[in-house]
Amino acid sequence: MYIEEVKGEMNLPENVRIFDTTLRDGEQTPGVALTVEEKTGIARKLDALGVDTIEAGFPAASPGEMNSIRRIVELGLEANICGLARVLREDIDAAIDCGVDYIHTFIGTSPLHREYKLKMSPDEIIDRAVFGVEYAAEHGLKVEFSAEDATRTEFDYLVEVYRAAEDAGAEIINVPDTVGVMIPRAMNHLVSRLKEELRVPISVHCHNDFGLAVANSLAAVEAGASQVHATVNGLGERAGNAALEEVVMALITRYDLPVDIRTVELVNISEFVSKITGVRMPPNKAIVGENAFAHEAGIHVHGVLEKAETYEPITPEMVGHKRRIVLGKHTGANALRSKLQEYGIEMKEEQFCTLYEQVKRLGDKGKRITDADLRAMAVTILGKASREIVKLEGIAVMTGESVMPTATVKLRIGDEVKTTSMTGVGPVDAAINAIQSLVSETADIELDEYNIEAITGGTNALAEVFVVMSDGEGNKATGRSTREDIVMASVEAVLDAINKILSLK
């Protein structure tokens, strides 16, 4: 409604290209280091998603980086494969040796970079930029040029640098907000002015230091920028980059702009990248977070059940997500009835009231209630014995100063008894690894969360272990156990969760 009223004030491009830099800037996330196989796996996913350009890495960084980029080039993907390079002959040669068809070359231009990092005069920087762009263009590469720290560079000088790069053969001019200092109105103003000065398309690369990377990217598009740099899940240096999934969905649904992205794959690639990098997404992460389409409050759930649009701006299916009705202290009776109906569970009113009170009571205690937990509670109230599909028959653990922690576990799975031994970083890890190994033939169930808390003091303190486990079908279950023995408490909690998940099948 209100967006339509202001669209006339925007200088929107005909379409927006997505330049993905997950494999370059995203890999610079502190603590993230990807193998060749992991990088090629992500590249395949990005290509299937439909991004226009994949920045595969920084070829001059190391021989291993060059090898990764070569492997990605050899995949023969639809996307342009780009390499990052400083405006140096050796950097550009490294990119050429990798076989990329696109180069993103840069040099710092702000007073800070000129004086402290580069120790070069403004004219020297322009000369270096021109050399780099010309050298890359002469070798048949498509050239995108960035003035690093552009948003802290004097405007007249910035235009001078960009025009020189443009005249030297740059086909795209990129505006990096290198340390995320811009606000949307300022970014819009800057890009609008640059559009008046330059001939080639303008791109933006926004960092998220103040949480404004996506907003600044969209503000640039409103001013006419036709390409956005982004990363899956917003990965990147410090606070990260503009999140690809957020930029894409905003462009498509808020601006009605054509973007060649298969949006139904967004959750899939988000989870894939999260798993490979080890960077977990907050549950409330926009578009792809676990809670992006989750509803607990009774009023909200009632509205969503009547018409999803009341509390959802887009359908979860559009991005490959699922709507979830979450149970907790804010849950209303309608939500609970809907959940029971979903699982085909029928209850008398008295039984329903008992279950409803239990849900509220657990919610007030801050306990998480998964669908599998609900089903287990309902089965108990209905007087039906819950199936203990996996039962512990025996366990022995060995650990010590010079001994690899090892656990031997015997489980009864259905009518079959199985035994295995596994190692781990400690006896608890070894025991859980052994259980997962034995159960893997029945179902692919993974440990998502593990928490332990001492309830009492002393060396014989009671420990409460809480776990969250999930399978490949999106089912989650919690498990709890309280024991003096931490290993046994952990084993019982894991088996509790596993049995809840298996009971859903």
Swiss-Prot record:
Q: What are the residue boundaries of the Pyruvate carboxyltransferase domain, all occurrences included?
A: 16-265
Catalytic activity, EC: 2.3.3.13
**Coiled coil: which residue ranges?**
none
Q: What class of enzyme is it?
A: transferase
| Matching InterPro entries | 2-isopropylmalate_synth_dimer (IPR013709), AIPM/Hcit_synth_CS (IPR002034), Aldolase_TIM (IPR013785), LEU1_arch (IPR011830), LeuA/HCS_post-cat (IPR054691), LeuA_allosteric_dom_sf (IPR036230), PYR_CT (IPR000891)
The record describes the protein's role as: Catalyzes the condensation of the acetyl group of acetyl-CoA with 3-methyl-2-oxobutanoate (2-oxoisovalerate) to form 3-carboxy-3-hydroxy-4-methylpentanoate (2-isopropylmalate).
Assembly behavior: Homodimer.
Q: Which family does it belong to?
A: Belongs to the alpha-IPM synthase/homocitrate synthase family.
Q: Under which name does UniProt file this protein? A: Probable 2-isopropylmalate synthase
Q: Which organism is it from?
A: Methanothermobacter thermautotrophicus (strain ATCC 29096 / DSM 1053 / JCM 10044 / NBRC 100330 / Delta H) (Methanobacterium thermoautotrophicum)
